[in-house]
């Protein structure tokens, strides 16, 4: 038995070692490469300038009346580079002693930079209407905003009314339409509160005092307990006004209510429920809408400024290409384009309503009978009725490219994976500020990534190869655009990219191994799928480390459990008859205890609150 334990332990450690390091794999070997997957740059896989791309018409980016120079070279591929100019002079790209090979790994140098534009990941909730979470207050479930990023320039328009939504909600004998959305007056005053007042108020709170103004405003609103329910995890949203540096807590978390069945736009009917909708309006450009979940490092992980001289694109094997299928709208300026993107962005607004307007009937009845608690309970729900609690999770038309020359706003719902340097464009998102612009395009990104990849591969080659001839081998990454012509290691003359503020060069004589499909999806070409079948998708190194740690821990736990099981089995085996006659064994006395109680949940022995439908499964509508 001891020998068996030793064998199991050795097997577990060997398995862990294989997961972490592989059999005979060198430490410096690229994690996504096989040892013999490199091909010389002049092999048949890398075609010359005359190579005919068979999918020109199918995937060519179309744009009507672009207004741009017909000789402009777009970064899109496989579009023809008809207007591309040759380099000013022929370059001696390779030393006579250099052997240059091209890597087969199709990595994306923009992965880290573009992480903040993965809105589904970084925000995780609706933008136009954010009702991404549910919370209980005094025994009743309500919806509330839950986005992790600030929404710059967002406010609420009350239809046919001069009342601003930042006015305190109506209370007492006030008519319903006399109030707005903000917290009613309190003593001491908690809303609105100036930035200086908040800093002083939380000066002794180590967790809050050093936060930036937006996160501080979000946490301040989260400190208020609704309906004196200290056990509730409901948190109010807030709006921060950059103009006067004030934090407004919103008593009403609803963001949209339209239609004659649900509201009345008649200003004269003061006691009827008002209609309202979210918007990015000129009067709101200093406002920022905040949920309880705004992360304290939002400046690093969330988009704020629009990107000048840039358009969102898709990384397709070595270059950033245009997104072929977009929705195009006219827009006079960036503000209008950003507003359009916001209107089409992810929304958690209910798709259907109950036949009986329970919540709004409460409001009317509350005012009629002067029942303050009824009015409060009616205002607390966040604009959604019980019949429909749709959650977008941040999926929507959240991105746009604004063409300043044609005054067109191109809106799309696919996550961009790179930026195209184009002086005619500004890239924007539904979260971004409607006016603020970032002017610095990261021109050196390609050159820096190429240098880093070549150095990493050189270390691997130095450890694995014994080259006695003195030839220096270079493994060039699959990056075919750079502001440094020599870094491309191109087998033909690179071409100058027109309309680029970075003076980029592009190498277009190496065949692409990926393409964009009709639904804006990047896929490996059919002829290369077998070659890339076993190569995992690119993940950051910290993800790989997590996998290694998790796998090691799992193996250790399994080995421990197995040893304990075998030890107990050994003890039980001593009680068994040596002839192994099953009729003498009997049954375990604890068998009934080991059986699962069908009335118990895996959370514990108590029944769930709703035993028949513990979780509501909804069909997503994308």
From Swiss-Prot:
Spell out the InterPro entries in the cross-references.
Apmem_Ag1 (IPR003298), Apmem_Ag1_dom_sf (IPR024056)
Whichever gene encodes this chain, its name is: AMA-1
Glycosylation-annotated residues: 162, 286, 371, 421-422, 499
Localization per Swiss-Prot or TrEMBL? Membrane
Can you cite an annotated GO cellular component?
A: membrane
> What is this protein for, i.e. what is its function?
Involved in parasite invasion of erythrocytes.
Q: Which organism is it from?
A: Plasmodium falciparum (isolate 7G8)
Question: Sorted alphabetically, which keywords does the UniProt record give?
Answer: Disulfide bond, Glycoprotein, Malaria, Membrane, Signal, Transmembrane, Transmembrane helix
Show which residues sit on the Extracellular side of the membrane. Answer: 25-546
Its primary localisation, in coarse terms, equals membrane
Q: Which family does it belong to?
A: Belongs to the apicomplexan parasites AMA1 family.
Spans annotated as Disordered? 577-607
Species classification: Eukaryota, Sar, Alveolata, Apicomplexa, Aconoidasida
Its membrane topology, per UniProt? Single-pass type I membrane protein
Q: Which cysteines are joined by disulfide bonds?
A: 149-302, 217-247, 263-275, 320-418, 337-409, 443-502, 490-507, 492-509
Cytoplasmic side stretches: 568-622
Can you tell which superkingdom this protein's organism belongs to?
Eukaryota
Indicate what this protein is called per its UniProt record.
Apical membrane antigen 1
- State the Pfam families in the record: AMA-1
Could you confirm whether the keyword Cytoplasm appears in this record? no
Q: Which Gene3D superfamilies match?
A: 6.10.250.430, Apical membrane antigen 1, Hepatocyte Growth Factor
Spans traversing the lipid bilayer: 547-567
Q: Which residues form the signal peptide?
A: 1-24
């Amino acid at each position: 038995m001891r020998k068996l334990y030793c064998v199991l332990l050795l097997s577990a450690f060997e398995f862990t070692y294989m997961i972490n390091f592989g059999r005979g794999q060198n430490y410096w070997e690229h994690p996504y490469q096989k040892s013999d997957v490199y091909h010389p740059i002049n092999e048949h896989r890398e075609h010359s300038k005359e190579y005919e791309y068979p999918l020109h018409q199918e995937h060519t980016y179309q744009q009507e009346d672009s207004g741009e120079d017909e000789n402009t070279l777009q970064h899109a591929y496989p579009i023809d580079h008809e207007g591309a100019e040759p380099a000013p002079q022929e370059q001696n790209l390779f030393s006579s002693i250099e052997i240059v090979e091209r890597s087969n790994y199709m990595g994306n140098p923009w992965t880290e930079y573009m992480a903040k534009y993965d809105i589904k990941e970084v925000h995780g909730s609706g933008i136009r209407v954010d009702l991404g979470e549910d919370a209980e207050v005094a025994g009743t479930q309500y919806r509330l905003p839950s986005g992790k990023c600030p929404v710059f320039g967002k406010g609420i328009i009350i239809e046919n009314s001069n009342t601003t939504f930042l006015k305190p909600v109506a209370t007492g004998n006030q008519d319903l339409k006399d109030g707005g959305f903000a917290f009613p007056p309190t003593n001491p005053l908690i809303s609105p509160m100036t930035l200086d007042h908040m800093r002083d108020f939380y000066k002794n709170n180590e967790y809050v005092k050093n936060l930036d103004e937006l996160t501080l405003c979000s946490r301040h609103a989260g400190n208020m307990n609704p309906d004196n329910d200290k056990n509730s995890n409901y948190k109010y949203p807030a709006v921060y006004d950059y103009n006067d540096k004030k934090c407004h807590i919103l008593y009403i978390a609803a963001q949209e209510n339209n239609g004659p069945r649900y509201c009345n736009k008649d200003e004269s009917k003061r006691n009827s429920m008002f209609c309202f909708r979210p918007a990015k309006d000129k009067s709101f450009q200093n406002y920022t809408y905040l949920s309880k979940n705004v992360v304290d490092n939002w400046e690093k992980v969330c988009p704020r400024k629009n990107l000048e001289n840039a358009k969102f694109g898709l990384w397709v094997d070595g270059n950033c290409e245009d997104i072929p299928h977009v929705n195009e709208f006219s827009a006079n300026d960036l503000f209008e384009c950003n507003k359009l993107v916001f209107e089409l962005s992810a929304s958690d607004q209910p798709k259907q309503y109950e036949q009986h307007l329970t919540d709004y009937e409460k409001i009317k009845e509350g005012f009629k009978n002067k029942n303050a608690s009824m009015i409060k309970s009616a205002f607390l729900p966040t604009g959604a009725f019980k019949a429909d609690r749709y959650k977008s999770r941040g999926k929507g038309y959240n991105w746009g490219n604004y063409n300043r020359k044609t005054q067109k706003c191109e809106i799309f719902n696919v996550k961009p994976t790179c930026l195209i340097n184009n002086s005619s464009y500004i890239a924007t998102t539904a979260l971004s500020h409607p006016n603020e612009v970032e002017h610095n395009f990261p021109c050196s990104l390609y050159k820096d990534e190429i240098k880093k990849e070549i150095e990493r591969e050189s270390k691997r080659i130095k450890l694995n190869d014994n080259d006695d001839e003195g030839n220096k081998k270079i493994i060039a990454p699959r990056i075919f655009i750079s502001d440094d012509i020599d870094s491309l290691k191109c087998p033909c003359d690179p071409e100058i990219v027109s309309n680029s503020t970075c003076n980029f060069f592009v190498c277009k004589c190496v065949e692409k191994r990926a393409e964009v499909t009709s639904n804006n999806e990047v896929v490996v070409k059919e002829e290369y799928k077998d070659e890339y079948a076993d190569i995992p998708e690119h993940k950051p190194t910290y993800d790989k480390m997590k996998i290694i740690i998790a796998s090691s821990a799992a193996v250790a736990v399994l080995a421990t459990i197995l040893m304990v099981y075998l030890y107990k089995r050994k003890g039980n085996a001593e009680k068994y008859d040596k002839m192994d006659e099953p009729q003498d064994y009997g049954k375990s006395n604890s068998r009934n205890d080991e059986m699962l109680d069908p009335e118990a949940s895996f959370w514990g022995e108590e029944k769930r609150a709703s035993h028949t439908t513990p979780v509501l499964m909804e069909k997503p509508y994308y």
